Amino acid sequence: MEYKRVLVKFSGEALSGNSGFGIDVKILEYIAGEIKSLVDNQIEVGIVIGGGNIIRGVSAAQGGIIRRTSGDYMGMLATVINAVAMQEALEYLGVDVRVQSALEIKEVCESYIYRRAIRHLEKGRVVVFGAGTGNPFFTTDSAATLRAVEIGADVIIKATKVDGVYDKDPHKFSDAKMLESISYDEALRDHIKVMDDTAIALAKDNKLPILVCNMFREGNLLDLLKYKKGICSIVK
């Protein structure tokens, strides 16, 4: 299958580098370069970034002072910060890009309108979707799947720090084996750590494949989408 329109999802933590917090500009530029390689090959790209490098709603609410709903809204705002940073990095590399937010912040970015997002993609612009779904209690993984379905993406790319889905944690077990392919039902049954169950269930309902790959393997995204030779696991 030829992938003409894709949704790339990666975590906010990926932007923070070794510090674990904030935005590492070198990593930001590297990721923007990987996205640019897709655009240069006529692949339409939407992006969803998490906000964990700034704040996580669940973590913020653990002490009881901040309510979960407020914590989640704080997390949504964090994703907008990351989206604006990615916009700047892509524009620095000469890529035309728009940020659309599920929460209205008209001085900073466009509000999310799916028809407008599709029009941007058709014109060759990258669209970075911020503020998750706009609702608390939903993860950015769920937001990524929702946006992918809405814009008619051919596939979701879940870009991580590992090469794919493993039978056990590769950071803890040296004999962990990567799975080239896994069904939606298997992913839901085993509660794989790559995406949450809500996101996987939505992908299943819409027959949307999920490619899980290592975003720090340079050139891998383009290899996967254009040359069908990259390293990944596929959930379908």
UniProtKB/Swiss-Prot annotation:
SUPFAM superfamilies in alphabetical order: Carbamate kinase-like (SSF53633)
CDD domains the record matches: AAK_UMPK-PyrH-Ec
Pfam families registered for this protein in UniProt: AA_kinase
Catalytic activity entry: UMP + ATP = UDP + ADP
GO cellular component: cytosol
A GO molecular-function descriptor: ATP binding
Regulation: Allosterically activated by GTP. Inhibited by UTP.
Any Gene Ontology biological process: UDP biosynthetic process
Region (Involved in allosteric activation by GTP): 17-22
E.C. numbers: 2.7.4.22
Enzyme's top EC category: transferase
Residues the entry annotates as binding UMP: 51, 72, 133-140
Keywords, comma-separated and alphabetical: Allosteric enzyme, ATP-binding, Cytoplasm, Kinase, Nucleotide-binding, Pyrimidine biosynthesis, Transferase
Domain of life of the organism encoding this protein: Bacteria
UniProt function note: Catalyzes the reversible phosphorylation of UMP to UDP.
Oligomeric form and interacting partners: Homohexamer.
Protein name: Uridylate kinase
Organism name: Helicobacter hepaticus (strain ATCC 51449 / 3B1)
